[in-house]
């Protein structure tokens, strides 16, 4: 079966049964029509738990390409942490146990919402209750959201947090994310949040719910709630433990630096306490703190396996998707593997891609044809049109985008047959197959559905339905290479 192989990723072109405002359905696509008649094809899942995202959540290019390249499901932080907590994972979590065993007092801080972008309130609650089992005094430092969730939803989340409060668990401070989660070195904001954590802010006489309402009365929404501390809280003390429950790192670094770094230049701290700090995920490579959920090292990716076989490979895309067919598909590895060639085609310089829906598909295609004629063993290519034009919400332009991709596929398929190349064609997620909602409003987001997968290969008569984690092993099988045990089964 061993053949030189093409892996083609048609970004943003998905499957949808309904034809209304389905750019893929309405496009003139003779190459796709030919493939439907002559090649085995199936449907591939690209969203939700099948790619390591929360149930029902739409896929994206970063996660999609990581999953394709790894050949297995890589659970994203939100899902990985939630699954661990549901299975009592904290019982054996050395970073968590180390942090809480060093003090009778544990401070927990995090974004109080279920937005799932930076944190999740369920994680907040799980850690607080686990600390309570160890007979700790737990202080909650609540960061109000209003950005990833409704602008005035804090009272709803506060009620959930208050349900676990008792003599052991107490709400100590509150701050809008504008202050506690700055990421732009505006340390005057961080200072206000820091001072409340240290008990340097005059405590409000109001209860947490009254305080939120008082901010609303001043037309201040959740994101911008002024940092404060509540009565009976005296600030952090030396040798107490602190765990930041946010799993996204960019907006967690500054306040963590202020709390933990002895050498800190953001602002002059009136008080600096020696805390036993732990973070939910890696926030900064220079932070020395224990990490509850370390980053997973992704090894034995498709590109790595091919490289170890001393075969050649070329990764080709235009600017908009270049990182996806290099860094992301290689498991977060920036440096090319041995015998890995990379081709970057410049995306057109237009304000929005509906002005040029063909984008740089022609130039990308020429690069693919050149690599095929050179006999490159594996060619990975991304066509960005379906996604980037789909994001504009322009249905007519999205139809043209699909047609441009179809033209490119026709040229590649023709040469593949001539040169005996195998081919696997799929998408990282959908987009352009659903361009308007039931009220005729433009849809610009990815879809949470399936995508097509076509295979051209010697002796391949049928392929199974699957998910993106089945792609890498399928490509390796076409190439006659044994897939590593870390990869999931192929589609045929």
From Swiss-Prot:
Gene encoding the protein: gpmI
Pathway: Carbohydrate degradation; glycolysis; pyruvate from D-glyceraldehyde 3-phosphate: step 3/5
Note on cofactor: Binds 2 manganese ions per subunit.
HAMAP family: GpmI
Reactions catalysed: (2R)-2-phosphoglycerate = (2R)-3-phosphoglycerate
A molecular-function term among this protein's GO annotations: manganese ion binding
Binding site for Mn(2+) 1: 387, 391, 446
Binding site for substrate: 118, 147-148, 177, 183, 248-251, 321
Record has RNA-binding as a keyword: no
Upper classification of the organism: Bacteria, Pseudomonadati, Campylobacterota, Epsilonproteobacteria, Campylobacterales
Name listed for the protein in its UniProt record: 2,3-bisphosphoglycerate-independent phosphoglycerate mutase
GO biological process, alphabetically ordered: glucose catabolic process; glycolytic process
UniProt subunit comment: Monomer.
NCBIfam families: pgm_bpd_ind
Cofactor names: Mn(2+)
Keyword set, alphabetical order: Glycolysis, Isomerase, Manganese, Metal-binding
Similarity field: Belongs to the BPG-independent phosphoglycerate mutase family.
Superkingdom to which the source organism belongs: Bacteria
Keyword Transmembrane helix: no
Pfam families listed in its UniProt record: iPGM_N (PF06415), Metalloenzyme (PF01676)
Cellular component annotations (GO), alphabetically ordered: cytosol
Catalytic residues of the enzyme: 61 (phosphoserine intermediate)
Record-listed E.C. numbers: 5.4.2.12
Role: Catalyzes the interconversion of 2-phosphoglycerate and 3-phosphoglycerate.
Residues holding Mn(2+) 2: 11, 61, 428-429
């Amino acid at each position: 079966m061993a053949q030189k192989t093409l892996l083609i990723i048609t970004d943003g072109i998905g499957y949808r049964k309904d034809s209304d405002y389905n750019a893929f359905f309405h496009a003139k696509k003779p190459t796709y029509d030919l493939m439907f008649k002559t090649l085995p094809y199936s449907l591939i899942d690209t969203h939700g738990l099948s790619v390591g995202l929360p149930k029902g959540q739409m896929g994206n290019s970063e996660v999609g390409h990581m999953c394709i390249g790894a050949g297995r499901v890589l659970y994203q932080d939100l899902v990985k942490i939630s699954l661990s907590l549901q299975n009592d994972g904290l019982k054996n979590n050395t970073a968590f146990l180390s942090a809480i065993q060093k003090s009778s007092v544990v401070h927990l801080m995090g974004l109080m919402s279920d937005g799932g972008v930076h944190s999740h309130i369920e994680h907040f609650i799980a850690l607080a209750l686990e600390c309570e089992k160890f007979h700790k005094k737990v202080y909650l430092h609540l960061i109000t959201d209003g950005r990833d969730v409704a602008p005035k939803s804090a009272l709803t989340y506060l009620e959930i947090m208050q349900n676990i409060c008792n003599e052991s668990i107490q709400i100590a401070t509150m701050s809008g994310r504008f202050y506690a989660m700055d990421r732009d070195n505006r340390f005057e904001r961080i200072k206000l949040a820091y001072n409340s954590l240290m008990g340097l802010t005059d405590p409000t006489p109001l209860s947490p719910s009254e305080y939120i309402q008082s901010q609303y009365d001043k037309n201040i929404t959740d994101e911008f709630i002024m940092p404060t501390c509540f009565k009976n809280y005296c600030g952090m003390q030396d040798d107490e433990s602190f765990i930041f429950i946010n799993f996204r790192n960019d907006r967690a670094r500054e306040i963590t630096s202020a709390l933990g770094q002895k050498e800190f230049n953001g602002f002059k701290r009136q008080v600096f306490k020696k805390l036993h700090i732990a973070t939910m995920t890696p926030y900064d490579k220079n932070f020395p703190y224990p990490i509850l959920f370390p980053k997973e090292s992704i090894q034995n990716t498709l590109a790595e396996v091919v490289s170890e076989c001393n075969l050649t490979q070329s990764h080709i895309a235009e600017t908009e998707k270049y990182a996806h067919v290099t860094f992301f598909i290689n498991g977060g590895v920036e440096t090319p593997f041995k015998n890995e060639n990379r081709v970057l085609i410049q995306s057109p310089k237009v304000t929005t891609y509906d002005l040029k829906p063909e984008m740089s598909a022609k130039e990308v295609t020429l690069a693919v044809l050149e690599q095929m004629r050179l006999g490159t063993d594996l060619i990975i290519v991304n066509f960005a049109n379906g996604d980037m034009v789909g994001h504009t919400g322009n249905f007519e332009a999205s139809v043209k985008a699909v047609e441009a991709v179809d033209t490119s596929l026709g040229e590649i398929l023709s040469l593949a047959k001539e040169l005996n190349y195998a081919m696997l064609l799929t998408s990282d997620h959908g987009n352009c197959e659903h361009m308007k909602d039931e009220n005729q409003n433009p849809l610009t987001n990815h879809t949470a559905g399936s995508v097509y997968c076509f295979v051209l290969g010697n002796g391949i008569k049928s392929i199974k339905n699957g998910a993106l984690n089945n792609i890498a092993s399928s490509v390796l099988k076409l190439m006659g290479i044994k897939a590593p045990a870390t990869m999931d089964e192929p589609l045929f």
